[in-house]
C-alpha cells in the first residue's frame, strides 16, 4: 500500500524513539502523534475566509480566539484572561493573556496583541474579503455598514484596542450567543504584518499559515490527481506549551475517503460515524460520545413549483405520521427543526420549548386540503412530484421516508418517488429552484437554534425562503435580551416554519465520535467538526 508511506514511516520511527526514551518511565500518555482522516483538502486556513468543515477542523488546532468550545459544549475563555459585560449587554471588555505568540513552520515569532483581533474583525467585514460568515457578526457596531460599503473608515468598527492587551467590542444590539460566536473560526485574530507578507496567499500553504494556537502547520501536501501522501502535518507549538501544556507531540490529518479502514488498522485513533456504520464500534473496545446535531426533513419548494399552494402543503403535512415509521439505528423521530443537542445555560432547546411545533396528523384535514388544491393544479404537475436526495448519504433514512410516501398514496392517492443524485447536483438544483420536494439534512454551524432556522431565511436562502414575519422573529431572537427570550422567539419561528408546511421534520441523526479505548481527553464539537487535542493522551 503506497498511500502515506513517507508519513507512516516517520510516525513509526517517531514512536520507536518515544518508546526507547520512555521505556524506563511509567506511561503518562503524553508525546503521541494522533492521526485523523478528513474527506477533502481544506479550502483555506484563513479563518475569516474559510467555509468548509475540513478548514474549520484545522483552524481549531492552529488558532485560538477569545473563547473556545469546552468539553461541555459551552464557550470558555481561551485568549481572554478575563472579561466583563456592561449592564446593557452591549459592551464586552477583555483582558488578554500576555504570553501568547505567533509562530509558523519558518519560526515566525511575535506576541499576540489586541491589535491582531482588531485587524481580524476589520478583515471579516471588509467587502473585498467576501467572508461567508460576516453577517453572523453584524451585532458588532457598524459592521453591517462597513460590509455594505456605506462606511469606509474602519476605525468606526466597534472593535478597538486599548494598549496591547486590552480589547473592547461594542455591539449595536444584544446577542445572547455572542460568546459562542467568538469561539468560531471567523473571530480568530490575524497578524497584519504576517498577512501582508503572505501576498494574497495567507492560509493557503504551510509557509503562509501563522499559528497562535497549540499546534502549527509543519507540512501541507495535496495533489488533486493523486491518492498518495495527501496530508497535513501539525506539531505542537513550543511557545504555547511554555504556558499551557500541549500533551501530544503532533497531529497528522490524512486527506482520503477510507476513514473506516484507517481507524480499524490504527492509522487514525478517532472517527465520526452515524447510522448502521457506527453500530459495530459501540462496544467495550472503543470509547465514544454521541450527539444529535442534525435533523432530516422534507422541504417543499414554495418558490418555483406546485407547492406554492398552501393547501397542497397542508395536505402532505396532515397526511404525514412519522410516529408510524420504522427508524434505522441511530435515527429517532423528529419533533422539530432543531435537534436535541442544541443547548444553552437553560438546557436543551428541545427540552425547554418541547414539541409544540409539531402538527398532529389528521387524515380528514389532509384529504380535504388535497381535494381543494387539486382543483387549481394541472394533474400532469402532480404526477411529476419527486423527492431529491443525496446519494451515499441519505439512503438509510430514505427507507423510512418511503413509509411517508406510502402514507401519502394511501390517504391522498398521490404518488411520489425518491431520486438519489450527487451532492453537487443536489446543491445545484436547490440553488436554481429546480425541484419540487427535497430530503433535507440540516446541520448547524454552531450551537444555536438560529443556526438551523436561518436556513429558511432570505439571508441564507438555501431553501425556499419563508416570509418576512419569519425572518423578523429570527432577527429578534438574535437580538434577544436573554437566552429565555431567544428560545421563545425561535420556538415561534419554528412553529411557523412547520405549520406553514415548508418543512416536515422526519428524523434526528445521532452522530458518534468514536476513539480507541487507549485515548483520553479528546474533545469533539459536533457543530463545527473541530477536535480539540490540546490535552489528549494515548496509553499503549
Which residue ranges define each predicted feature?
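Gly/Pro-rich hinge or "lid" segments in bacterial periplasmic/extracellular proteins
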Residues: 155, 164-165, 171-246, 255-257
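A bilobed periplasmic-binding-protein/Venus flytrap-type ligand-binding module shared by bacterial periplasmic
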Residues: 235-240, 287-315, 319, 328, ...
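Detector for C-terminal structural segments
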Residues: 317-348, 396-403, 430-540
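Ligand-site clamp/hinge motif
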Residues: 233-280
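Ligand/substrate-recognition segments at binding pockets and active sites
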Residues: 226-229, 371-441
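Structural transition elements
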Residues: 331-374, 392-398
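Aromatic- and charge-enriched surface segment that lines or borders ligand/interaction sites
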Residues: 81-136, 168, 306
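N-terminal lobe/hinge region of extracytoplasmic solute-binding protein
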Residues: 37-87, 210
Amino acid at each position: 500500500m503506497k498511500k502515506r508511506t513517507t508519513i507512516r514511516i516517520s510516525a513509526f520511527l517517531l514512536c520507536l524513539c518515544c518508546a526507547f526514551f520512555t521505556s524506563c518511565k511509567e506511561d503518562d500518555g503524553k508525546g503521541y502523534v494522533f492521526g485523523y482522516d478528513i474527506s477533502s483538502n481544506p479550502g483555506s486556513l484563513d479563518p475569516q475566509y474559510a467555509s468548509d468543515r475540513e478548514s474549520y477542523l484545522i483552524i481549531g488546532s492552529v488558532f485560538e480566539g477569545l473563547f473556545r468550545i469546552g468539553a461541555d459544549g459551552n464557550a470558555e475563555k481561551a485568549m481572554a484572561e478575563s472579561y466583563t459585560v456592561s449592564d446593557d449587554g452591549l459592551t464586552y471588555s477583555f483582558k488578554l493573556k500576555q504570553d501568547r505568540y505567533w509562530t509558523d513552520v519558518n519560526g515566525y515569532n511575535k506576541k499576540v496583541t489586541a491589535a491582531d483581533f482588531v485587524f481580524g474583525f476589520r478583515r471579516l467585514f471588509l467587502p473585498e474579503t467576501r467572508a461567508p460568515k460576516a453577517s453572523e457578526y453584524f451585532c458588532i457596531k457598524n459592521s453591517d455598514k462597513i460590509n455594505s460599503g456605506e462606511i469606509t473608515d474602519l476605525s468606526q468598527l466597534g472593535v478597538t484596542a486599548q494598549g496591547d492587551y486590552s480589547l473592547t467590542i461594542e455591539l449595536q444590539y444584544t446577542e445572547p450567543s455572542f460568546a459562542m460566536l467568538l469561539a468560531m473560526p471567523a473571530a480568530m485574530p490575524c497578524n497584519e504584518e504576517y498577512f501582508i507578507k503572505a501576498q494574497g496567499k495567507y492560509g493557503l500553504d504551510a509557509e503562509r499559515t501563522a499559528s497562535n494556537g497549540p499546534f502549527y502547520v509543519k507540512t501541507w501536501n495535496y495533489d488533486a490527481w493523486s491518492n498518495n501522501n495527501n496530508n497535513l502535518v501539525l506539531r505542537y507549538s513550543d511557545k504555547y506549551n511554555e504556558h499551557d501544556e500541549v500533551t501530544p507531540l503532533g497531529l497528522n490529518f490524512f486527506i482520503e475517503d477510507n476513514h473506516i479502514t484507517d481507524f480499524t488498522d490504527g492509522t487514525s485513533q478517532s472517527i465520526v460515524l452515524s447510522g448502521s456504520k457506527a453500530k459495530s464500534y459501540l462496544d467495550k473496545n472503543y470509547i465514544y460520545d454521541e450527539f444529535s446535531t442534525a435533523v432530516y426533513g422534507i422541504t417543499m419548494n414554495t418558490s418555483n413549483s406546485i407547492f406554492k399552494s398552501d393547501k397542497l402543503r397542508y395536505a402532505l403535512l396532515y397526511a404525514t405520521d412519522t410516529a408510524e415509521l420504522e427508524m434505522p439505528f441511530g435515527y429517532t423521530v423528529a419533533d422539530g427543526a432543531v435537534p436535541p443537542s442544541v443547548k444553552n445555560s437553560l438546557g436543551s432547546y428541545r427540552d425547554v420549548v418541547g414539541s409544540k411545533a409539531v402538527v398532529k396528523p389528521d387524515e380528514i384535514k389532509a384529504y380535504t386540503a388535497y381535494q381543494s388544491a387539486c382543483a387549481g393544479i394541472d394533474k400532469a404537475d402532480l404526477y411529476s412530484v419527486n423527492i431529491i436526495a443525496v446519494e451515499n448519504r441519505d439512503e438509510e433514512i430514505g427507507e423510512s421516508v418511503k413509509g411517508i410516501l406510502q402514507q401519502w398514496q394511501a390517504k391522498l392517492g398521490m404518488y411520489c418517488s425518491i431520486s438519489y443524485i450527487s451532492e453537487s447536483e443536489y446543491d445545484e438544483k436547490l440553488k436554481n429552484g429546480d425541484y419540487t420536494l427535497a430530503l433535507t439534512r440540516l446541520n448547524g454551524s454552531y450551537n444555536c437554534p438560529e443556526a438551523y432556522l436561518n436556513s429558511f431565511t432570505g439571508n441564507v436562502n438555501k431553501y425556499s425562503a419563508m416570509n418576512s414575519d419569519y425572518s423578523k422573529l429570527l432577527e429578534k431572537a438574535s437580538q434577544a435580551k436573554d437566552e429565555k427570550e431567544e428560545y421563545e422567539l425561535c420556538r415561534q419561528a419554528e412553529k411557523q416554519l412547520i405549520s406553514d408546511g415548508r418543512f416536515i421534520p422526519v428524523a434526528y441523526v445521532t452522530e458518534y465520535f468514536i476513539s480507541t479505548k487507549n485515548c483520553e481527553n479528546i474533545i469533539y464539537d459536533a457543530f463545527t467538526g473541530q477536535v480539540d487535542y490540546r490535552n489528549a493522551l494515548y496509553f499503549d
